[in-house]
Structure formats: C-alpha cells, structure tokens
Regions:
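Transmembrane and membrane-interface helices of multi-pass
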Residues: 9-195
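Short, basic, low-complexity termini and linkers enriched in Ser/Thr/Gly/Pro
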Residues: 1-11
Length: 196
C-alpha cells in the first residue's frame, strides 16, 4: 500500500519550497529601499530594470546564503535573519555614507564604521522610515519562517553536509567567479559608477 500525501502537506511543502526564493527576493527589494530611502516605480525603471543581471546575481547570493545556513543549521529563522542582514546592513551603511559624503558605500568603509556612526549622530542623521519598515518585514518573515518550518523532517548529517557544501561552493563560485572578476562584472553591465 502506497502512502499518498494530503493536500495540506502538499501545500506546506510547496510553501517551504517557495519561501527561500521569495523571501530573499523581498530582502533584495528591501535592500534597495533602504539604500535609496524610497522605492517607487521610477526606482524600478531607472535603477533596477537597466541592471537586471546585477540584481539577479545579488538575489542569487542572498538565496545561496539562505540555503547554506539552512542546510548547516536546519533552523530557517537563522537563515532568514542572516540573509536579510547580509543585504540590509550594507544598504543601511550605504544610505548614511551617501548622506554624509555623497558617494556610495565602498568595502574599505567597513574600517570606519564606529567613526561614521559618531559623525552621523553629530550630523543629525536619524533612522529612516525605510529602515523601520524593513526591520518589521524582516522580523515578520523570521518569525513566519519559524512556524513554517517547525516540525520539518530531520536529515542525516551526510545529507546536511552535502547540501551545505553544494550551497557554499555555489556561493564561492558566484563571489570569486563573478563579483570579484572585473571583466565578468563589466560584461554583465555591473560598473562601479552605475550605482550613484
């Protein structure tokens, strides 16, 4: 006798399959919302659509990070929170740096985070509505992922390590094979001055 899954279990499985790509896509939009301070149709047309390849790659990075953390820990809320932070924290720093000096966040700015926080405070720059809204959305998705993935089947360590290794390898390939290769990023239309 074969076991046929119920409609409810199929819906739950479908929701669990759709959650990571949809949540990480939403995190990508929140990242843009935070960095620009607003998200409108004009933002989509002027900044996102012309650089669709770059945004697709950024979404892929957030998705792969979600998958790697989930495979390793089997704790979806942690995967959700970390992938959201990976996008939203640099966007927050970028927003403040644009406010302070008129140019985007650059990797070496990480060395000056504490100094920048003091300058931002002295300059009267405050938490923006986009950051609060994004925080609420991230919190809701993190809590929602707890309930969505609660009670899911435990996997043996071998499967978990294999999934983690595959996700991590794909993440590294994306970082080292695309993002850190100027010729590749240039061929995809990802230019340093395109984000100003």
């Amino acid at each position: 006798m074969t076991h046929h899954p119920s409609a409810a279990s199929l819906r739950l499985h479908g929701a669990r399959l759709l959650f990571p790509p949809v949540a990480t896509l939403l995190f990508l939009l929140l990242t843009e919302y935070i960095a620009r301070g607003a998200l409108s149709g004009d933002t989509l047309v002027q900044y996102i659509f012309p650089h669709a390849e770059a945004y697709l790659l950024a979404w892929g990075l957030l998705f792969l990070v979600w998958m790697a953390v989930d495979w390793l820990t089997r704790f979806a809320p942690l995967a959700t929170l970390l992938s959201a932070l990976l996008g939203c924290l640099p966007a927050t720093v970028d927003f403040y740096i644009l406010q302070l000096r008129g140019e985007p966040f650059l990797p070496w700015d990480l060395m000056q985070v504490s100094e920048a926080a003091g300058v931002a405070s002295a300059a009267g720059i405050h938490v923006q509505k986009s950051m609060v809204v994004s925080g609420v959305v991230v919190l809701a998705l993190t809590v929602g992922s707890f309930f969505l993935y609660r009670g899911r089947q435990k996997l043996p360590w071998v499967q978990r390590l294999a999934g983690f290794a595959a996700s991590t390898a794909a993440t590294c390939a994306l970082i080292f094979g695309v993002f850190l290769q100027p010729a590749v990023t240039q061929s995809l239309g990802i230019l340093p001055d395109a984000w100003m």
